[in-house]
Regions:
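Residue-level detector of anion-binding/catalytic polar loops
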Residues: 51, 89, 177
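Flexible loop/turn connectors
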Residues: 121-122, 142-249
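Hinge/beta->alpha junction and helix N-cap segments in small-molecule ligand-binding domains
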Residues: 2-12, 31-32, 57, 67-78, ...
Length: 249
């Protein structure tokens, strides 16, 4: 078992993996490639006899690839429901994926939850397709644009916790207090979110369960040629980055 990262020269890296005749690979993150190039690389591995497990929806209809899905639909549904219960009606999502991305469907999940709980509220989605890294820097710049164009926004949902930290920094730039004037929700519930100031409300999942299920899926694919997709349930962990909408305190 090897754990590795390939941020650069991805195609050369994959060619080396194929040459080494590895048994299987678990792809967790999305490389900065076009959809077509990414699909080509995946199927090159499949054709070489490598068993492939993918985190997420990419090539979800393939009968040759196993998938593990984090059930963000339930988590985003809980997040929007919770924000509504706290009086928020102007809720935005900040993303580094464009609308209707082949790599990520959380934008559609957000729109669905808004239709369900706040059908009369605006659906505010800010993204930049040229940005591939969902990190603090990207969310900081996106949130500055968001709060300039939509100062009425009182809550923001982010693709991950790192982006939530960037939103909190951007709020400080506009002298907006978190959570008194802006509530912020991240995803993944990484360890630092429990110690960040303020602590970050996050859509999270059991990392141990995720790791065990990923290993089991790939092992069964390699040893028994069992191809399977599974969902990992999510929860909303409420902390101090969210609160009542302004004017309701």
């Amino acid at each position: 078992v090897s754990i590795c990262t390939a941020q650069r020269e991805i195609e050369n890296y994959i060619r080396r993996l194929i040459a080494q005749r590895i048994d299987g690979v678990f792809i967790v993150g999305m490389p900065p490639l076009s959809d077509e190039k990414y699909h080509e690389i995946i199927f090159n591995m499949v054709e070489a006899g490598i068993r492939v497990l993918i985190n997420g929806i990419i090539l979800k209809d393939s009968k040759e690839i196993s998938h593990i899905f984090v059930d963000h639909m339930t988590g985003i549904d809980k997040a929007v429901s919770y924000l509504k219960s706290m009086g928020h009606t102007h809720i935005a999502m900040v993303s580094t994926f464009g609308r209707n991305s082949n790599f990520d469907i959380r934008d559609r999940m957000f729109f669905s939850a808004m239709d369900k709980y706040l059908p009369d509220s605006p659906k505010i989605f800010v993204s930049e397709t040229g940005i591939r890294n969902p990190d603090m820097d990207s969310s900081y710049s996106l949130t500055k644009r968001l709060l300039t164009d939509h100062p009425e926004v009182t809550a923001v949902i982010c693709l991950n916790d790192l982006m939530a930290y960037g939103v909190i920094q951007a709020a400080a730039y506009f002298n907006k207090s978190v959570p008194d004037e802006l509530s912020v929700i991240g995803m993944d519930d990484i360890y630092i979110s429990r110690n960040f100031n303020p602590t970050v409300t996050s859509i999270g999942f059991d990392k141990r369960e995720y790791g065990m299920m990923a290993f089991e899926l790939l092992y069964n694919h390699i040893k028994k040629n069992i191809i399977k997709d599974i969902d990992i349930r999510t929860e909303l962990y409420i902390r101090s980055s969210t609160g009542l909408a302004p004017g309701l305190k």
